[in-house]
Design a protein with these regions (language model features):
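Short, well-structured N-terminal submotif of metal-dependent ribonuclease cores
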Residues: 1-40, 53-60, 120, 132-135
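Acidic, PIN/NYN-like endoribonuclease modules and their adjacent C-terminal/linker elements
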Residues: 2, 71, 103-135
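A general alpha-helix detector
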Residues: 9, 47-48, 84
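Active-site-proximal, substrate-binding regions of enzyme catalytic domains
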Residues: 25, 45, 52-73
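General small-molecule cofactor/ligand-binding pocket signal
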Residues: 39, 75, 126
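Short, conserved alpha-helical segments within structured domains
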Residues: 40-44, 81
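Active-site neighborhoods of divalent-metal-dependent phosphate/nucleic-acid chemistry enzymes
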Residues: 73-115
């Protein structure tokens, strides 16, 4: 099963944002052990760097990102995904781009804590806890 992991869930893990970090850790453990195929969008990686750069020194942050990216694949956000996001007219453009990335990389689900922003998505959005219960 292939899942696109939304930025907020990745930040829950890497920023140790409790109480959400527990379910995020379980999700990434499934990726690490190969039980699921986890994907983050290319924009998620830049967002993570931007959000954590004031909390973690640069070298440590690069190491954290390298380890993180050894566990998940990076999905492209190219012109096709950007134009698809624009066409969707979603109120949250960033989430529309995530949705398009999920579609183009063949994800079965988008795992996110803000499912309401993905109502118009072609790929079903599901919370980390709901996803873990499905397995």
């Amino acid at each position: 099963m292939r899942v696109l992991i939304d930025t907020n869930v990745a930040l829950d893990l890497l920023g140790d944002r409790r109480p959400f970090s527990e379910s995020a850790a379980k999700l990434f453990e499934l990726c690490e052990t190969g039980k699921i195929d986890g994907v983050v969008s290319a924009t998620t990686v830049t967002d993570i760097y931007y959000m954590l750069r004031k909390m973690i020194d640069r070298e440590t942050l690069y190491s954290v990102l390298e380890k993180f990216l050894s566990v998940v694949d990076v999905g492209d956000v190219t012109g096709g995904e950007v134009f698809g996001a624009l066409k969707s007219r979603n109120a949250d453009f960033e989430d529309a781009a995530q949705s398009e990335c999920a579609r183009s990389c063949g994800a079965d689900y988008i795992v996110t804590r803000n499912e309401k922003d993905f109502i118009r998505s072609k790929v079903q959005a599901i919370s980390p806890n709901e996803f873990l219960e499905k397995l």
